[in-house]
Amino acid sequence: GTLHSQLSSCYLTTVPDDLYGIYGAMRDNAMLSKWAGGLGNDWTPVRGMGAHIKGTNGRSQGVVPFLKVVNDTAVAVNQGGKRKGAVCAYLETWHLDIEEFLELRKNTGDDRRRTHDMNTANWIPDLFMERVMNKETWTLFSPNEAKDLHDLTGNEFKEQYEKYEEEAKKGNIKAHKEVDAEELWRKII
């Protein structure tokens, strides 16, 4: 046994889109890792790079700089010296930062935007795979402008996603980017 037994060996959390929530999640990660817990963090709610921040009237740096801190925290805390810290970051395929997220584990590029000790994974909706097979485009959104996508699946997701695409074309959604679905798929695999 251990002095601090846990009810679970792995903890899955969703990180909110505000600094208190983001750094609270990092603190929670450190404490859970201290007692040998593995971690999975859903970063989808955090606004994408370039998205407007109302409180400061500035622009977001996106999820990647925060993931670098999470990576380094896992290395520093290392599950109480028992084994290497285990953390995985998750992001949905429609998130504005997905392309940079897919680069996190590469050995080339700016090391300040790499997480060599963290695993990454992303959720892929059926609609994305349809777009890949049909050689169509895929639109990336910042979750602060597409708030409910993260909670939808199936036809509900498809209907809302396509509404957001129309709103983006009309100029009503500022933080978005259209990409080739097949090209994004190649980056994923």
Predicted features by range, described:
Residues 1-8:
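N-terminal flexible segment immediately upstream of the FAD-binding catalytic core
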Residues 8-189:
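Active-site cavity-forming subdomains of large catalytic enzyme subunits
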